[in-house]
Structures are given as structure tokens and as C-alpha cells.
Amino acid sequence: MDPALARSALESGLNAVIAAEPEVTRYDTVVGDGDCSIGLKRGAEAVQQLLQSSKLSSVDDAALFLDQIIGVVETSMDGTSGALYAIYLNALASGLRSQSGQSEARAKVWAAAAKSAMQSMAKYTPAKPGDRTLVDALAPFVDTLTQTGDVHKAAKAADDGANSTKGMKASLGRTVYIGGQGFQEVPDPGAYGLAQFFTGLAQKL
């Protein structure tokens, strides 16, 4: 992995998450307790600070790159979504390490690791597409990346997946307990925020 390209793409994704904070807050105020955007923004800003500290300037190993990001995510994001991100990223790093000797196209290596990470995350959460969670954006991204090797198509699939949660009744998460009809009006905040990250990421790849 080209460190400069990786940082540029990650920075773009993080900027997209931060820019989406008002919209995520609006959605979460309708169907949640309004703290989803706080966690996402806090995590994004913490990773930005790491990138700007130049500690990653000499990193040319993708798994090691992720390890440093994971450390920040684990300390800056709380709640269920923070735990899921940490679990997924740890599994993603492990998946990349298992393929370190392969000569496949870079996107295919990342896709295989991403798919493996999805399987690992499933051991810790019952969330699946259709449950109105961040998985509604993550799963189509991983599936499309696996099928096509195209990050832009994968990001579009994530965006479509997030938008599909509008009107979807929640099976998991706080929305289940809050109830009401707000879910008919807005997409899942976590899925929307993650889709924005993927869209920003793809713009630099």
C-alpha cells in the first residue's frame, strides 16, 4: 500500500464523516438519542489527529497501518458501534496479514480481508442486512468490492444500502426501544454515517 495514497483516502473519508455530522445528528434525533453522530465525529477527529501527527509517514504495511488506527478507535469511540468498528478493523488487519504473501490485485486482497472480517464480526453481533444498522451499509460495500474489485461501485452500494433503511423497522439497537414512526422518515444514522465515509474514501482511490 502506498502510504501517501492511504492517508489521502482515509483523510477524505474522515472529512466526509465530519461533514455529515449535522445530518447524522438530525436522523439520530428522530430515531435514537442523538449520540451516534458524536461518536462518529469523535472517532473521525481522533484518527485525523493521528494522521496529522506524522506517526504514519513511514508506514508501508497495511496491517500495521490499521493497527495504529484501531488503537485510536478503541479509545475514542464508545458504545456498541465503537465496539463493532474495533472488532471489524481488528479482523480486517488479521485478514490482511493472512494474505501478506499474495500477488493478487490490491483491491482483491482488501476485498478478501473485508469479507473475512465480516464473518468474524458476525460472531459478536446478530446484525445482518435488513436490521437497520451500520451493517446495511457495510455488507453491500464488502459484497460489491468482493464481486467487482471496484471501490467506487462498492461505495455506491453502501450508499444505496444506507438509503434503503429509510422506512425499515429496526430489529436491533436503540430504535427498537424508542419506537415511534420516525424510522419511516429517515435512514439509519449509523449506516448513513458509514456510507459517507466510504464515499469520501472512494473519491481518492
Label the model's feature ranges.
Residues M1-L205:
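N-terminal loops that bind phosphate or other acidic moieties
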